[in-house]
Curated annotation (Swiss-Prot):
The keyword Oxidoreductase does not apply. Its cofactor is NAD(+). GO terms for biological process: L-histidine catabolic process to glutamate and formamide; L-histidine catabolic process to glutamate and formate. GO terms for cellular component: cytoplasm. Its EC number is 4.2.1.49. Gene3D superfamilies: Urocanase like domains (3.40.50.10730), Urocanase superfamily (3.40.1770.10). It comes from the Bacteria. This is Urocanate hydratase. It catalyses: 4-imidazolone-5-propanoate = trans-urocanate + H2O. InterPro entries: Urocanase (IPR055351), Urocanase-like (IPR023637), Urocanase_C (IPR035401), Urocanase_central_sf (IPR038364), Urocanase_CS (IPR023636), Urocanase_N (IPR035400), Urocanase_Rossmann-like (IPR035085), Urocanase_sf (IPR036190). It comes from Shewanella pealeana (strain ATCC 700345 / ANG-SQ1). Belongs to the urocanase family. NAD(+) binds at residues 52-53, 130, 176-178, 196, 201, 242-243, 263-267, 273-274, 322, 492.
Length: 562
């Protein structure tokens, strides 16, 4: 019997103000754990899989049930420890300590590879937490929409004189992360052709309005893109096809998109990427009987796709790796120049990270969309001079369907996170919001990740692989009073290639919450500014000085420079 598979389970988070736990500080992680497994949120909720190949919310259903049970009895001065999706201990702490501390899929570096992890996984000794799956703050594809949108806008500025009109994007993958691309692309003014091998994923994205149209042949998809470009009305098309096949065929035909990227689950060659010529059913069976053959075939197909991406780049396409480690997989398969196209962070996002700007998000525990709309208005009120941000909030309200509990993603930085959170807390206190909100972020943030093929690629000082930073981030957030803190390995790019930390905090309208919010949501983005200032980025150094950060070695460097 598979302890992870139970098709009878249908998990829906409670809403409203009635508590099933002893306080909002334990009710919040309970609801967010459940929300991660909502049928409109998770990719395979019956298997506890939230997104990203096998990114899970709990190790198995027995562990899930026990986590729920413990959260419902947890006292306000106790902390639950969750080890790779398994609740392993409850300890007396204090009321400003985290209620939950999570560690997922962390391995001693010598053994930090998929082969060793998969052995542990099969024995029921580990769980892949991805980033926000195992840390209980996934909000569906909206969680990556704005970051993807910001990247595509930056690409238009850098490559197309600021205009995406008549331009189109070629990409792959419509899973939990990749599913954001078509909507983000059309919001940024491009048409988007996304290849996906699983028709149910295309249909899901159609239903949730992340994709406009479905095509079953490349000719049909290209005709849709061509018509959209001629009419000036961007369209997103989900093409039922293998990305490696399509990318290579476009090279053969001499058709060059304006932008090329990919967000298949290439980080996990066993569970996340379908080899060319294989059916989904064939892959599922082969994973049970010959893992090595699946991995080899998947990497060979990735090599084909990356070679095509390089050829399209040479033909003039703006080409970028969108953080799934496909370049590394192709490199291991003999594509020596796989890294000739850049990752999206060093190419387009790092200046934002230097100011602590990243994917700030919040969720209405009430379940009432009006609570999110009221917070949208509060963000506009408190940040009145940012038309780009206002435009994002307007588009998000108009075009993004909530998945599970209503939520919002909003890229803001050190200057704004704490004051927004304190304003939300005041709105809970005075009754403007009908229930508390939880505030968190992706692990993809400025100070919370070490990932040499993604967030920390090509750091100015060569410190790409130094992972002290996310460890310090997690420890500082714990000391600052976050509601739950997580420390993961392998998210985004796979085993052996990243370490990263997450933080979530509850705004319940109390004075104690205000004190915690002020500490956590200042310190958390400040570690990102610190990390980039330490690496030598002038934007970060200037931000640190402007915001009065106490960075002893930066102060020394400034003094020496006088």
């Amino acid at each position: 019997m598979d302890k992870r598979h139970d098709p009878s389970r249908r998990i829906i988070a409670p809403t409203g103000t009635e508590l099933s736990c002893k306080s909002w500080l334990t009710e919040a992680p309970l609801r967010m754990l459940m929300n991660n497994l909502h049928p409109d949120v998770a990719e395979r909720p019956e298997d506890l899989v939230v997104y990203g190949g096998i990114g899970r919310a709990a190790r198995d259903w027995e562990c899930y049930d026990k986590i729920v049970e413990v959260l419902q009895r947890l006292e306000e001065d106790e902390t639950l420890l969750v080890q790779s999706g398994k609740p392993v201990g409850v300890f007396k702490t204090h009321n400003n300590a985290p209620r939950v501390i999570i560690a997922n899929s962390n391995l001693v570096p010598h053994w930090a590879n998929w082969e060793h992890f998969n052995e542990l996984d099969k024995k029921g000794l580990a769980m892949y937490g991805q980033m926000t799956a195992g840390s209980w703050i996934y909000i569906g594809s909206q969680g990556i929409v704005q970051g993807t949108y910001e990247t595509f806008v930056a690409m238009a500025k850098q490559h197309f004189n600021g205009s995406s009109a008549g331009k189109w994007i070629l990409t792959g993958g419509l899973g939990g992360m990749g599913g954001a691309q078509p909507l983000a692309g059309t919001m940024a003014g491009y048409s988007v052709l996304t290849c996906e091998v699983d028709e149910t994923r295309i249909d899901f994205r159609l239903r949730t309005k992340y994709v406009d149209k479905k095509a079953t042949t490349l000719d049909e998809a290209l005709a849709m893109i061509d018509e959209a470009n001629k009419s000036g009305k961007p369209v997103s098309v989900g093409l039922l096809a293998n990305a490696a096949d399509v990318f290579a065929e476009l090279v053969e035909r001499g058709i060059t998109p304006d932008v090329v990227t990919d967000q298949t689950s290439a980080h996990d060659p066993l569970n996340g990427y379908l080899p060319q010529g294989w059916t989904l059913e064939q892959a599922i069976e082969m994973r049970k009987t010959d893992e090595a053959a699946v991995v080899k075939a998947a990497k060979q197909s990735m090599a084909v796709q990356v070679k095509a991406m390089l050829a399209l780049q040479a033909a003039g396409a703006a080409t970028t790796d969108y953080g799934n480690n496909i370049r590394q997989m192709a490199f291991e398969e003999g594509v020596e120049n796989a890294f000739d196209f850049p990752g999206f962070v060093p190419a387009y996002v790092r200046p934002l990270f230097c100011e602590g700007i990243g994917p700030f998000r919040w969720v209405a525990l009430s379940g009432d969309p009006e609570d999110i709309y009221k917070t949208d208005a509060k963000v506009k009120e408190l940040i009145p001079d940012n038309p780009h941000l206002h435009n994002w909030l307007d588009m998000a309200r108009e075009r993004i369907a909530f998945q599970g509990l209503p939520s919002r993603i909003c890229w803001v930085g050190l200057k704004d996170r704490a004051r927004l959170a304190l304003a939300f807390n005041e709105m809970v206190k005075n009754g403007e919001l009908s229930a508390p909100v939880v505030i968190g972020r992706d692990h993809l943030d400025s100070g919370s990740v070490a990932s040499p093929n993604r967030e920390t690629e090509s750091m100015l000082d060569g410190s790409d692989a130094v992972s002290d930073w996310p460890l310090m981030n997690a420890l500082l957030n714990t000391a600052s009073g976050a509601t739950w803190v997580s420390l993961h390995h392998g998210g985004g790019v796979g085993m052996g290639f990243s370490q990263h930390s997450g933080v979530v905090i509850v705004a319940d309208g109390t004075d104690d919450a205000a004190a915690r919010l002020g500490r956590v949501l200042w310190n958390d983005p400040a570690t990102g500014v610190m990390r980039h200032a330490d690496a030598g980025y002038d934007i970060a150094k200037n931000c640190a000085k402007e915001q009065g950060l106490d960075l002893p070695m930066l102060e020394k460097a400034t003094t020496e420079g006088k």
